[in-house]
Every structure is written in C-alpha cells, then in structure tokens.
C-alpha cells in the first residue's frame, strides 16, 4: 500500500508498554517499550532478564492488555510471576518442543491481533528441529541463525500491522580470539540485532544485603540500540528476591537525582519530612 504522510493514515504518537521500572522507562526516552516493534533484552545468567519481562507483562495486564509468554527454556515459574504482579490465569503460556514451533506460535499470536505483547524466553533455547532429531555431537552450523533470520523477515510486517510488542530474551556467548573490543556476542546470528528497534543490556552490578543475608541484586540497564529515541542512556535499580523491581528505592533515587528529595548522610528528606 502507498500512503501520504498527511496524518490521516499514520498515528504519530507511539504506543508504549511500561517496563515496571521508572528508570528504564526514562532511559528508553518514550516512557516504555514501543508497541509494533521488536525488542531484545540480553545479559548474563541471573541478571534479571526474565524478571524485567514479567514486570512489563504485569504493567501491560494492569492496563487491560493480553500477553503471551513463549517459554522455550521450560523454566517459567508461575509462583514468582504472581509475586511480580502477573495475572497468571490470564497469561497465554506456551512451552514449545522446537524452535520452529515456538516461532510459528509467535507468528500466529501476532497475526491474530488478539495479543498486545509476546515474550520469547529465550532465543538461545530455540533449537532447530533438525538438531533435536539429530544425534548428540552432530554439527548444525548456522541453523539457528537461519531460523531466526527467516522468522524475523516474516514477523516484522505482522508486528507493525497489529501493533504488537514482541520481546526476545537472549543470552550472551563469548567469541573466540577477539583481541580488541568486547568478546561478548548474543546467540542466534545477527538478524535480531538489525530487526530490533530497542536492545537492552542488563547486568547485575552488586548484591543488596540485610545483615548477612543477600536479599536482592543491584542492576544496571544500558540501552544499546534505540530507534525511537536517543540510545546509550542507562538506568540503575534494585531487584529484590521474591518482589521484583524495588519501586520505592527507584523513586527515592530519582528524587535525589532531580533534587526533589534531599539526601544528607543516610537520611532522605522531602519538604522537611524525613
């Protein structure tokens, strides 16, 4: 189709879904993850990738949205999801057998126009059918990359048309023999890097302790790529075990940053009230 950009066809305001973290929403520049786009969230193990996605699902459901979770890792924990505010009984959950099946389900959900957000956890676990049916030790070079490339070619048009947010969670691998620059790379080839409108790099930077007990992680998110606002912004927040993103802690930190809350030593005060 051909259209004139006179405003009659195109919505100029971007629809977004909050990530459940104030800092990340601000870092994204548009107030959340953009709908009608592909988003990639990657990082090391136990850095908070799935937690951030579940927080976003909870926010989407709060606003009446319908969400789907394609659990290729077969590690979805409904009890933890419920603690983060996810309405598990309203969540579409799929645990596919092969990578092809997972991406086919994703395509069907997107094309239906009946869901607002689809999360694929994770790209690394999308195993091609040939690899599952083959023997251990067989070489399947580039199969997963080809699978992702083909799927994203098919998906992007449908995603834009139905205004669905599709989030791919990805893991990190090390490239061998890299002398300069970062040896880190994400799995599943290069296609996702190109098709993603937003790429978030999430890292655990420290532990939160109460006495001797570790009760959570200090987390840092970098916006590595952003097609809807300026990239390379950062956000730091706390993820508490069994609770998710510490909303109060983030609010106070942002208050200090923008001089709304005063900090003196270990005390915080707002309008004179400590």
UniProtKB/Swiss-Prot annotation:
Effect caused by changing residue 42 to L: In strain: Vedros M1801
PROSITE patterns from the UniProt entry: RECA_1 (PS00321), RECA_2 (PS50162), RECA_3 (PS50163)
Does the record's keyword annotation contain Protein transport? no
Please provide the Gene Ontology terms (biological process) for this protein: DNA recombination; DNA repair; SOS response
Q: Where does ATP bind?
A: 43-50
Tell me the SUPFAM superfamilies matching this sequence: P-loop containing nucleoside triphosphate hydrolases (SSF52540), RecA protein, C-terminal domain (SSF54752)
Keyword annotations from UniProtKB, A to Z:
ATP-binding, Cytoplasm, DNA damage, DNA recombination, DNA repair, DNA-binding, Nucleotide-binding, SOS response
**Which interval of the chain is the signal sequence?**
none
Supply the CDD domains for this chain: RecA
Q: What is the effect of changing residue 245 to I?
A: In strain: Vedros M1801
Provide the GO MF annotations for this entry: ATP binding; ATP hydrolysis activity; ATP-dependent DNA damage sensor activity; single-stranded DNA binding
A single GO CC term for this protein reads: cytosol
Q: Where in the cell is it found?
A: Cytoplasm
One Pfam family name is RecA_C
Report which superkingdom the organism of origin falls in: Bacteria
UniProt-listed InterPro entries: AAA+_ATPase (IPR003593), DNA_recomb/repair_RecA (IPR013765), DNA_recomb/repair_RecA_CS (IPR020584), P-loop_NTPase (IPR027417), RecA-like_C (IPR049261), RecA-like_N (IPR049428), RecA_ATP-bd (IPR020588), RecA_C_sf (IPR023400)
Q: What NCBIfam families does the entry give?
A: tigrfam_recA
Q: Which family does it belong to?
A: Belongs to the RecA family.
Listed HAMAP family: RecA
- Purpose: Can catalyze the hydrolysis of ATP in the presence of single-stranded DNA, the ATP-dependent uptake of single-stranded DNA by duplex DNA, and the ATP-dependent hybridization of homologous single-stranded DNAs. It interacts with LexA causing its activation and leading to its autocatalytic cleavage.
Q: What is this protein called?
A: Protein RecA
Gene name of the record: recA
